[in-house]
Amino acid sequence: MTFGCLVDQYDQLVASSFGSNSRILEKHLTEYSAKTVGKALTRSDHWFTQEMIRRFEGVKNPRDVKLNRDFVSTHQARVCAVLEKIPIGKVTTYGLISNHIGSGPRAVGVAVGSNPWSIFVPCHRVVPGSLAIGNYSICGTLGENGSTTKRRLLLHEAVPIEEDKIDSTALWNPSEGD
């Protein structure tokens, strides 16, 4: 697995992504950079990239990361604010988020699917109302390994999964808080 981050001049995270193909990852982040800050990618030894790997591997007590929110819409920022509150070991649904912020579930789905801060803002903790695992966007596109990656991330966080369904005890409602 290859990991990459895009960081601004203030050491804030602009975007992050990962995937099995380093060329696709670099292309994805380079294109995102051209639309936003025009900065180069971080090196693999940069602390942002190392922190991303730690989180991917399920390490507890993550280091605080400042996000550059200048390049997301107000709607996406509202959705991401909810995502950041989902506790480790829990999931929520597109519908619960949409009810909480007063938006349509499809609009929430678009915001979740275009989350620029992969791993740091846990979009993998959002599942369909059926509590199926669902898919996961890698490098900006849905791939054949998306649901496998999402399952891996959720299992690292001790989300109870039986076959391809999340146990309802892991469901978190943003309107009810923690």
Task: For every predicted segment, state its role.
Residues 73, 102, 117, 144-147:
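Short, amphipathic alpha-helical segments
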